[in-house]
Amino acid sequence: MIEYNLTTARNIYKLLKSEFRDLPKSKIVAHTTKKHEKVCDGTIGSAYAHAHSEARKNSRYKNQICIQQKFLCSASLMEIAEMIAHEAAHLVIRGIHGKRWEKRYERHYDFLKECKKNGELERCEE
């Protein structure tokens, strides 16, 4: 289930990137709540996911989205879509959840809700 939902998350990001061309090429990985050196240089803690948007120069984690394995075990398609919309907004708008970030997140999430209505989002599960 983890690998299936991880692939779904990657496909949702590709769908989002097809509409929002300024999104960077991104790597999406899963890891446990503890520090996992080969996957990420930080801990994910209780958050479902986090983004490495301002990684150190030449860091291998730049533009990486890390998702908690526990979340991937039970997340629905729309929960994954909402999380990807959230983290993708962090890759474009640096910093905290300010007004600019909120607007960008809403644009991402509205696009994905529209994709759900027309059946495009379900194809991300294949």
Question: Where in this protein do the model-derived segments appear?
Answer:
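Active-site-proximal or metal-binding-adjacent scaffold patches in catalytic folds
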Residues: 1-82, 91-126
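Walker B catalytic acidic pair
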Residues: 87
